[in-house]
Swiss-Prot record:
Its EC number is 5.3.1.16. This is 1-(5-phosphoribosyl)-5-[(5-phosphoribosylamino)methylideneamino] imidazole-4-carboxamide isomerase. InterPro entries: Aldolase_TIM, His_biosynth, HisA_bact_arch, Isoase_HisA-like, Isoase_HisA-like_bact, RibuloseP-bd_barrel. It comes from Neisseria meningitidis serogroup B (strain ATCC BAA-335 / MC58). Coiled coil: none annotated. The active site is at residues 8, 131. GO terms for cellular component: cytoplasm. PANTHER family: 1-(5-PHOSPHORIBOSYL)-5-[(5-PHOSPHORIBOSYLAMINO)METHYLIDENEAMINO] IMIDAZOLE-4-CARBOXAMIDE ISOMERASE. Keywords: Amino-acid biosynthesis, Cytoplasm, Histidine biosynthesis, Isomerase. The gene is hisA. It comes from the Bacteria. The keyword Metal-binding does not apply. One of its GO terms (biological process) is L-histidine biosynthetic process.
């Protein structure tokens, strides 16, 4: 089970949001590159970046911070990024900078054909992020809940060639309320590609539950507030996950 530290970028700083609300941002660091190095030194084997401003603007907004992070750690571990990725040109620019994978979120739900085009243009490099409230996909920085069920979308995107799905339960993200294991497993059981859990990770019991779900296709978990506020020691948690594999 791979634990993936999240670095959410807002105006060049590392922050965490509650339930995707920009006004509910807590600043954890003014140096995202130092934060990235910290998690690498703690044993992280992959990093998850989110351009929060980009997610709302629809175009990249935190390029200097992203470049600094890649300069600091991309030679050692893969880095993935989502937020504001709406066209093939942006994907190409990001991959040229040194990102390992890009995550398509809102654009995937609004324009599913874009996912197929991206997978053809950049095979093996595309992840789809599905954010859900009560099983229904949410878009535009979680501002809008659609009528599309995430399971139906995941099946389509698997057929299009995405390498994995990141599943976020937006009712739990940043709330320290525990992972929605049942919903994550249900999604993972419907597709053959890996599913990464995101949102709600609070303690080592969540790690144990996720590791037990690994046999169903849950391949990893993105963790944010818990490791920044200290309810989870990242190095200890990854060691636990490794021991349970």
């Amino acid at each position: 089970m791979l634990l993936i530290p999240a670095i959410d970028l807002k105006e060049g700083r590392c922050v965490r949001l509650k339930q995707g609300l920009m006004e509910e941002a807590t600043v954890f660091s003014d140096s995202p590159a130092e934060t990235a190095l910290h998690w690498f030194k703690q044993g992280a084997r992959r990093l998850h970046l989110v351009d929060l401003n980009g997610a709302f603007a629809g175009v990249p907004q935190n390029l200097p911070a992203i470049k600094d992070i890649l300069a600091a750690v991309a030679k050692d571990i893969p880095v993935q990024l989502g937020g504001g990725i709406r066209d093939l040109k942006t994907i190409g620019q990001y991959l040229d900078l040194g990102l390992n994978d890009v995550i398509i979120g809102t654009a995937a739900v609004k324009n599913p054909d874009f996912v197929r085009e991206a997978c053809k243009a950049f095979p093996g490099r595309i992840i789809v992020g599905l954010d859900a409230k009560d099983g229904m996909a949410a878009i535009d920085g979680w501002a809008t809940v659609t009528g599309h069920h995430v399971i139906d979308l995941a099946k389509r995107f698997e057929d299009d060639g995405v390498n994995s799905i990141i599943y976020t339960d937006i009712g739990r993200d940043g709330m320290m309320s525990g992972v929605n294991i049942d919903a994550t497993v249900k999604l993972a059981q419907t597709v053959r590609i890996p599913v990464i859990s995101s949102g709600g990770l609070t303690g080592l019991d969540d790690i144990r539950a996720l590791c037990a779900a690994e046999k169903h296709g849950v391949a990893g978990a993105i963790t944010g507030r818990a490791i920044y506020e200290g309810s989870i020691d990242f190095a200890q948690a990854q060691q636990l996950a490794d021991s349970l594999d």
